[in-house]
Amino acid sequence: MNINKLAERLGLEPEDYMEVLELLVDSGKADITSLEQAIAAGSAEEVVAAAHSIKGASANLGLTELSEAAKDMELNAREQNLDGMSEKIQILKAKFEPVAALFQP
């Protein structure tokens, strides 16, 4: 992940991009928890909401792979299809982890 390139693409200074990215990480952690709970409860509506949140925030920051993983979950849940969501959330978490790792001590 090239922070300078992503920031430049959005017309931001790298420091400003990192501030916004940190907000995404904070909200993303909560959204992932919500996704896990929604999947366990079989709530397609809640999966849609949490996946949509991650999709939009990550797309706005140029994190295409993370956005696509969330989009896949959202589209399936919109069709009331929760099959394979356990695998899909693992893929999403794998895309999210490198971003979150930027803010770990």
Regions found by a protein language model. Give the residues of each.
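Two-component system phosphorelay core
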Residues: 1-49, 53-105
